[in-house]
UniProtKB/Swiss-Prot annotation:
Heme binds at residue 455. One of its GO terms (cellular component) is membrane. Belongs to the cytochrome P450 family. It is a single-pass membrane protein. This is Flavonoid-6-hydroxylase. 6-OH hydroxylase involved in the biosynthesis of polymethoxylated flavonoids natural products such as pebrellin, aroma compounds which contribute to the flavor of peppermint, and exhibit pharmacological activities such as anti-allergic, anti-oxidant, antibacterial, anti-proliferative, and anti-inflammatory effects. Catalyzes the 6-hydroxylation of 7-O-methylated precursors such as the conversion of genkwanin (GENK) to scutellarein-7-methyl ether (SCU7Me). Can also use apigenin-7,4'-dimethyl ether (AdM), naringenin-7-methyl ether (SAK) and naringenin-7,4'-dimethyl ether (NdM) as substrates. Pfam families: p450. It is found in: Membrane. Pathway: Flavonoid metabolism. One of its GO terms (molecular function) is iron ion binding. The gene is F6H.
Amino acid sequence: MDFNAAVCAALAFISLLSYYLIWLRSASTHQAPPEAGGAWPFLGHLNIISGHTGLPHVSLGNLADKHGPIFGIRIGVHRAVVVSSSEVIKELFTTNDAAVSSRPSVKAGKHLAYDYAMLGFSSYGTYWRQMRKLVSLELFSARRVELQRNVRVSETAHFINELYSAWEERRDGSSRVSVEMKELFGELSMNVILKMVAGKRFSGGDDAEEARRCRRVMREFFHLAGLFVLSDAFPYLGWLDLGGHERRMKRTAEEMDELVGEWLAEHRRKEYSGEGKAQDFMDVMLSEVKGANFECEYDVDTIIKATCGTLIAGGTDTTAVVFIWALALLLNNPHVLQKAQHELDTHVGKQRRVNESDLNNLVYLQAITKETLRLYPPGPLGGTRRLTQDCHVGGYHIPKETWLIVNLWKLHRDPRVWSDPSEFRPERFLNGEKSMDVKGQDFELIPFSAGRRICPGTNFGLQMLHLVLASLLQAFDLSRVSNEEIDMSESAGLTNIKATPLDVLIAPRLPPSLYI
């Protein structure tokens, strides 16, 4: 072969190799994630998402063991990807965050959320950004959280005093009495968020019926908000309401609208009469919406009711869920409970009540909160997202309009990150994971999500969790009502509330004068 022929052959080989590499790269960039098996004809994996095969986050976690940290499922006519590794989630919530910050259109958003006016259901856009900014600045900013200190402190003190009164009334010669804590935690959470948002609280007596009504509506709201109905999977079956779920959604939405509408009317009457200055978030909203140019089709009343309603429902349920799981875990691990009480006795003592200025010194208590949020994130699957652009994530191509499900429960039990991931061991946050935070910067631990759609009330929620847990552990000796471990069964839904009651034996451990 002469020189020119050799050069031509080499150039041809290089060209062919280049074309092959370009084709290979193009093919790899359009490679879809592996598809999970077990799909039903027509329905796809709807049986898993709807909870018919068990808790959805657990079932999806089992599929991740087979298919890896990113895999595809079908929900009727919709394609979805499920992710559960910190590397993939970081890529989604940083590089691709804007593209994955929208929500799919589901019946809960239409019927329960004022036709997607509620922040949690509205898609990423101008309206969402305006409402998010208002909520972040006027309710959950560091300045506002500090200004609301008295609400947290007074409601926590009332909660402790009510527990002491229950002990006094029921003790009947015994040093310990049994109380059911799920309901009490729900009342506490509701009163705190109601006071902040609408300036209201329920204290029993004449308020008892309205309190029960409010809690029932909020519970029903969260239960229904987590349901996938048939027409979510098959939009062309929107006329078919199998199981009556849409009818229940509409009825609950009417009750929610009536409740929040009554509070809004009270605030308007107060505003017109000139009574007092703006004190709660609803007052602030009434002031802010005057002359504001919200780029949306909603009227002012709808915006106020939708925003306040979602804050009350979300703040009540998610905070109570974490209180319940934290106490249940402590009762099943009494050595951890005793260690936390020893820390309180050392740094605070028993001659005064713990206060917020003490919390930074209670590092073991903070570790307990982190470990609770790791094992039982209040929304184990977060909220379903919808991609508004094609994305390349984890080596896979994910097309526009795909639904995204982030399995926080599985993420937080990754054995590559957490030793003995299913064990409750707060000490892990005093050792190797000491610097790991829960505020969306460490993608191995994101119980409040991350990126643009991180929970705006994260700082407030953590402050409340620490104060209530510290106050409860300082004020009472706590134990199980029997030798059997606390039942840790979860309920399926938007939040994973404990499926069974939480009965606890309590006895005071402070001087009686501190319970007044």
